[in-house]
């Protein structure tokens, strides 16, 4: 009887020690990636399955709540896909701050299918037409470098690995059924805020060649939507859209503006208004919130019943619960290169 009691106490003690050990690890490393995620390399993660790609080309480490919502909504809509967030401020030796310091980053790192990687442009641009351009450029002297470096990186990543690139002010609401596609911002005009291709698609290779040949940092969008549009015109005979139907050209789909831009950039403030009857967005796959237009700092406010608050509540509920405050402590979506 005594031996059984001793054995029982020993087992209980071991269990308690194990629990305390795990608790200590979690308490001191709330921001760290789970071990099963930290050992997965980029190539292994993206080489055999499609993924969703986000970029942060500034040095900031704490994603604004709109970035958090974009990543969370993508992870929710594509639960079987890796959602990869490249961050310039993150390195292999970056010390992991506490949960209280960077709550959004900590939350995103804990989502099962979200993976955070350092943005190493030199490595990403290797074996592409952009590599020699990058080695010759003086980034500090370039206008709009954060946006241009983002434009270059997204082309190289999707060309190498395939998948879907999204700006960090895009809220996913349903899966995109296309493999090779561009998103129309308007008739005969393509955006580069969201696009998807299979690996090594020649359209993206030609885009990278044109990026270098016609590089001009003084022209806003020249390496971004203007590039996509002029290359699409080379590949396809563009026509006006008829109703809500997409255009097909070779093996590329040019998706109707309603798919991602049902509210145009001229009307971006409508996201921050209360609607009598909210739109269903039943033909849209994702919503681009035009955060770059939000120079006046319009905020997402808990309890406001604005369209954007209700989108957060439905499509990124954890971000809404943890990061969105009431009128006394409202926060805006900070501007960044990935939310144009």
UniProtKB/Swiss-Prot annotation:
The keyword Signal does not apply. It comes from the Eukaryota. The keyword Metal-binding does not apply. It is found in: Golgi apparatus membrane. Residues 26-340 are lumenal. Glycans are attached at residues 99, 138, 251, 282. Residues 1-4 are cytoplasmic. One of its GO terms (cellular component) is membrane. GO terms for molecular function: acetylglucosaminyltransferase activity. GO terms for biological process: carbohydrate metabolic process; epithelial cell proliferation; glycoprotein biosynthetic process; negative regulation of epithelial cell proliferation; O-glycan processing; protein O-linked glycosylation. This is Alpha-1,4-N-acetylglucosaminyltransferase.
């Amino acid at each position: 009887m005594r031996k059984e009691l001793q054995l029982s106490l020993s087992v209980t003690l071991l269990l308690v020690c194990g629990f305390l050990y795990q608790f200590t690890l979690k308490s001191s490393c709330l921001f760290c990636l789970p071990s099963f995620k930290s050992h997965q390399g980029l190539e292994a993660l993206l080489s055999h399955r499609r993924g969703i790609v986000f970029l942060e080309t500034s040095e900031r480490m704490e994603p604004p709540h709109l970035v958090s919502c974009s990543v969370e909504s993508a992870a929710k809509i594509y639960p079987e896909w890796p959602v990869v967030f490249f961050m310039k401020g993150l390195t292999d030796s970056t010390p992991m701050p506490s949960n209280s310091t960077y709550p959004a980053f900590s939350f995103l790192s804990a989502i099962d299918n979200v993976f955070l990687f350092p943005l190493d442009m030199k490595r990403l641009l290797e074996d592409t037409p952009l590599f020699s351009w990058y080695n010759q450029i003086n980034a500090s002297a370039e206008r709009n470098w954060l946006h241009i470096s983002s434009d270059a990186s997204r082309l190289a990543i999707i060309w190498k690995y395939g998948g879907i690139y999204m700006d960090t002010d895009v809220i996913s609401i349903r899966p995109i059924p296309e493999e090779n596609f561009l998103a129309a911002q308007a008739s005969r005009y393509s955006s580069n805020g969201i696009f998807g291709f299979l690996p090594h698609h020649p359209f993206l290779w030609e885009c990278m060649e044109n990026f270098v040949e016609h590089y001009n940092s003084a022209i806003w969008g020249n390496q971004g939507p203007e590039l996509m549009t002029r290359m699409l015109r080379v590949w396809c005979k563009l026509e006006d859209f008829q109703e809500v139907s997409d255009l097909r050209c070779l093996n590329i789909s040019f998706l109707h503006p309603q798919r991602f831009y049902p509210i145009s950039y001229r009307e971006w403030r409508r996201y921050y208004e209360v609607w009598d009857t909210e739109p269903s967005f039943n033909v849209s796959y994702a919503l681009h919130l035009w955060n770059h237009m939000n120079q006046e700092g319009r905020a997402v406010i808990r309890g406001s019943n604005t369209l954007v608050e209700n989108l957060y509540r439905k499509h990124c509920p954890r971000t809404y619960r943890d990061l969105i405050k009431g009128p006394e402590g409202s926060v805006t979506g900070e501007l960044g290169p990935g939310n144009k």
